[in-house]
């Protein structure tokens, strides 16, 4: 899994007034929590967060706060409802010996049999929620769809990945090949 380096500055003041003042200085308020450690409130420059937030990739974040390193993942982002600016970011501290729950992007690989027959491949889920140790996380979950026929689906219950437990409902559809109008007309004739 990819890693991302991020430098943060401990926050001296908490509350609405302080947060507004930080945002005017292009600082985004953040919090780091997890494990039995104390919660750490800190700020990060807005520009430094862009490459972490506006990407489909998932990263292990190496947070450097006052010369101390923390392993973490991006847990939650709050956006402004009107202008979509980042308002607040939550990071979850991760440990080598404790499993973590994270969403990993799904990639469909191969040319499905149903597409050759005139169908259309539909990706129903872009990410899957998995539980495991961070060292076992792949950058993407690759699913082979070559044997997927017209009108058939791939469900979460049919998938398995090494050292990862899938937490989505077993009957959730990940990918399907649907009948197109042209395929329907050729089938009915």
Curated annotation (Swiss-Prot):
GO cellular component terms listed in the entry, alphabetical order: cytosolic large ribosomal subunit
Does the UniProt entry include the keyword Cell membrane? no
Transport keyword on record = no
Gene Ontology biological process? translation
The UniProt subunit note reads as follows: Part of the 50S ribosomal subunit; part of the 5S rRNA/L5/L18/L25 subcomplex. Contacts the 5S rRNA. Binds to the 5S rRNA independently of L5 and L18.
Q: What does this protein do?
A: This is one of the proteins that binds to the 5S RNA in the ribosome where it forms part of the central protuberance.
Q: Which family does it belong to?
A: Belongs to the bacterial ribosomal protein bL25 family. CTC subfamily.
* Name the UniProt record assigns to this protein: Large ribosomal subunit protein bL25
């Amino acid at each position: 899994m990819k890693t991302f380096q991020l430098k943060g500055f401990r926050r001296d003041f908490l509350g609405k007034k302080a947060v507004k003042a930080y945002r005017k200085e292009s600082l985004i308020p953040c919090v780091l929590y997890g494990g039995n450690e104390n919660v750490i409130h800190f700020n990060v420059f807005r520009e430094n967060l862009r490459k972490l937030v506006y990407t489909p990739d998932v990263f292990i974040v190496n947070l450097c706060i006052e010369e101390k390193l923390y392993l973490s993942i991006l847990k939650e982002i709050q956006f402004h409802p009107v202008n979509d600016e980042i308002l607040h970011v939550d990071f979850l501290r991760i440990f080598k010996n404790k499993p973590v729950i994270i969403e990993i992007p799904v990639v469909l690989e191969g040319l499905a049999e149903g597409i050759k027959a005139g169908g259309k491949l539909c990706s129903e889920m872009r990410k899957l929620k998995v539980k495991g140790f961070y060292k076992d996380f792949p950058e993407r979950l690759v699913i082979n769809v070559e044997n997927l026929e017209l009108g058939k689906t791939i469900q979460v219950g049919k998938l398995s990945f090494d050292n990862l437990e899938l937490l989505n409902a077993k009957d959730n559809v990940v990918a399907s090949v649907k009948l197109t109008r042209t395929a329907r007309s050729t089938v009915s004739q």
